[in-house]
Amino acid sequence: MGQKINPNGLRLGIIRTWDSQWFVQDKEIPALIKEDYLIRELINNFSKKSAISQIEIQRLKEKTKNRIKIYIHTAKPGVIIGRDGDTRNKMVAKLKELTQKDVDLNILEVKNSEKIALLIAQNIAEQLENRMNFRHVQKMAIQKALKAGVKGIKTLVSGRLNGAEIARSEGNDEGRVPLHTLRADIDYASLQAYTTYGVLGVKVWIFHGEVLPGQTILDTRKPFVFTNNRNSKYPSRYFKGGPKNVNTKKN
C-alpha cells in the first residue's frame, strides 16, 4: 500500500498536519474547500516561477471569520514581494476580490530548497522542458539533495523519454526511502513537464528521518551527513557510477 498511495496523505494526522486549518459548521465545509482550492490556484498562477513549496491557509477564530491568514513558503521571496512590495500588494488585491474577505498575506523564505520535494520536482520539470537529458537532470538533483543533508531520495520520470516511440519510466534512488513506515518523514511531489514530444511525469520522494514520540517533522529535517570507511561526506558508491538506475516499462 505504501508504494502506491500518496505518502503525504497517508501520514496526515500521524506525523503531518493539514495545509488548511479552520473550524466551521458542516454546511460551510464545501464552500471553504472550494475557496481554498481557488486561492492556491490563483497564487500559483500569479507567480509561476517563484519556487513556492507550500501554501498554508488559516481561519482559526470565530471573531475573525471574515479574515484569512495565508502563509506562502517560497525559495524566492523577492519575486513575490516585488519592488517596494508592489507584486505582493497586487496579489492581495486579487485575493480580496476572489474571496470578498480581508486577507493577511505572509511571505516565508525557504532556506534549503534542495531538500524540498516540490521544489526539486519543479527544477527537474523546468530542465526537461529546456531539453536537458533526463538522466543527467535526475543525477544532479540527487547530488544536490545529498549535499543538503537528506537521508534518502528517489526520483522517477515517465513518458516519451528522449522522444522515444514507446513511453517508459526511468528513475534513480540513493539512500533509504521507507514508504511503508508511517513514522518516516517522507516528502513527496509529482508534476508534469510539457515538452515537444508530449507530457512527462516527474515524481520525487525524499526521506528526512523517523519522527519518534515527542518529536515533530521539524526535528527530522536537520542536515544528515553520509559517512563511509574513508571518512568521506558522501557514500563511496556515489563516486562509482553514481546512483542506482532503475528502468521499468510503462504499459
Curated annotation (Swiss-Prot):
GO terms for molecular function: mRNA binding; rRNA binding; structural constituent of ribosome. SMART domains: KH. SUPFAM superfamilies: Prokaryotic type KH domain (KH-domain type II) (SSF54814), Ribosomal protein S3 C-terminal domain (SSF54821). Disulfide bonds: none annotated. InterPro entries: KH_dom, KH_dom-like_a/b, KH_dom_type_2, KH_sf_prok-type, Ribosomal_S3_C_sf, Ribosomal_uS3_bac-typ, Ribosomal_uS3_C, Ribosomal_uS3_CS. Residues 39-111 form the KH type-2 domain. Keywords: Ribonucleoprotein, Ribosomal protein, RNA-binding, rRNA-binding. Transmembrane segments: none annotated. Pfam families: KH_2, Ribosomal_S3_C. GO terms for cellular component: cytosolic small ribosomal subunit. It comes from the Bacteria. One of its GO terms (biological process) is translation. Belongs to the universal ribosomal protein uS3 family. PANTHER family: 30S/40S RIBOSOMAL PROTEIN S3, SMALL RIBOSOMAL SUBUNIT PROTEIN US3C. Binds the lower part of the 30S subunit head. Binds mRNA in the 70S ribosome, positioning it for translation. Part of the 30S ribosomal subunit. Forms a tight complex with proteins S10 and S14. This is Small ribosomal subunit protein uS3.
